[in-house]
């Protein structure tokens, strides 16, 4: 595949993913408030699930066009999920003395992200 085309697919997917993450964070911030960064957590968990689905589909169906992986996995999921925001939010919790929230958020994010990725793979392999 053409390198320039790959970059364009990643850029387009990343743009859409970033917009979706912003909308999700905006919605959660207005509905649930900011006691826990629900938008970031939800984006990271859903993105982990989706990347599991994309890679499982590409493994299961050899004719799956690799361009979709660039668009969906590297692009959309890369823009939708955010390790840097997660890191900043956990630092703010620690700095504010919210130690239990800090530990809970780390556990939910890391274990949940891995679990959601496995769930995405499992779903494709079993259906």
From Swiss-Prot:
Catalytic activity field: fluoride(in) = fluoride(out)
GO molecular function, one term: fluoride transmembrane transporter activity
Gene that this sequence comes from: fluC
Presence of the UniProt keyword Protein transport in the record: no
Membrane topology label: Multi-pass membrane protein
Main location: membrane
Protein name: Fluoride-specific ion channel FluC
Activity modulation comment: Na(+) is not transported, but it plays an essential structural role and its presence is essential for fluoride channel function.
Transmembrane spans: 8-28, 37-57, 68-88, 100-120
